[in-house]
Amino acid sequence: MKTLRHINISDLHLSVYSEPTDYIDELMLIIDYIDKLKESIDVLTFAGDIFDRVYPANHKVIQIAVDFMTTIAERARLYDFKVFLLKGTLSHDNTQLDIFSSLESPNFHIVRNVEFIDVEGLLFRFIPEYYSNTYEELYEEALTTKADVTIYHGSIESAMPYAKALKADTHKMAQVIKDRDIIETTGIYTVCGHIHNRINIADNIWYTGSFSSHSFSDAGTKKGFDDITVDLDTGTFKVNFIENRYCRKYIILDGTDICKSTVKKMKAFFNDLKLDKKAKDIIRIDVDTNSYNDEEYKNLSFIMSSYKGIFQFKIERQVKTQEVKSIEEDAEYVLSPTIPLTHKIQKTIEEIYEVNLSVDRIKELLDISDIQKPTINDEIKEGVQVW
């Protein structure tokens, strides 16, 4: 049986970590896997969004990316496989893939525009995220020729419910490929980048998902890349998902019950959680405080300040009608142009410090004369100096 071995990696997003070097052990997972397969690999594709944002040339993310891709290019020459870097979203990759231009060779190619390339007898179609005024322009350039395999960065109609960043101007400009057009013009399979969830559009159309975790929307999901084997005799394929076991974990815990207990119990719980927490992982505690009394809410506030920087807290609290009314009344009082500043200060001091100062004493402290300065709506009368 003659086969083609295709590794697809999507949405690296170098670097979403505050410390870019945290990504190195994850990138080494890819290198180690290549070294394991060696000459059995035929093609390695990166399906867009190598970078998380645009970085200056001297940024350490750029250096990590160059070192990583240099290693990939060396392995491609050593084991004789093809590498294709597909340009992703404008706000992420932009023109930054050009920093890899010196690596380009018969084994290493940057795909900036729609291209059709033969790999081991299969026609690969590469479609970067496509920006145009009309869908017809995309269709004419990319979808009038049938391909065996399509590598695409962007949105497909059926994947739109999963797209999370469509409000961004760059995403509004990008075209969305219609399901029927990708189905009718791809013979074996289509694998996509751009959406970070791993989702199947059809049996032969799917999103690999991001290589690593990027936010709490990734909580509870596995990250990694695809190892695809194509039977060239039958045109069938199988996919083996390789998990990124080193990626950061975003963990969401329901803390409503534990955070209603005593400070002592909460400290014991969070201290144990702190000991079990890996350095890269981020844990969020979701707390519904609508049934909390004042003392319980106060205890929670103390715990939140005690573990600031270690855990994140998401608090759910419905503002009661009387609280809204009180806030509105306070706002009206503070913003009212008819109430003198001294009276506003008097009320604020009384509410916060429970001290009752007379208006005369406040004037004295502020060195205000008996002739009051005008309020906002006072008018300067002709011939009268009020300041």
Residue ranges and their predicted role:
Residues 10-14, 49-51, 89-91, 128-130, ...:
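Active-site metal-binding loops of divalent metal-dependent hydrolases
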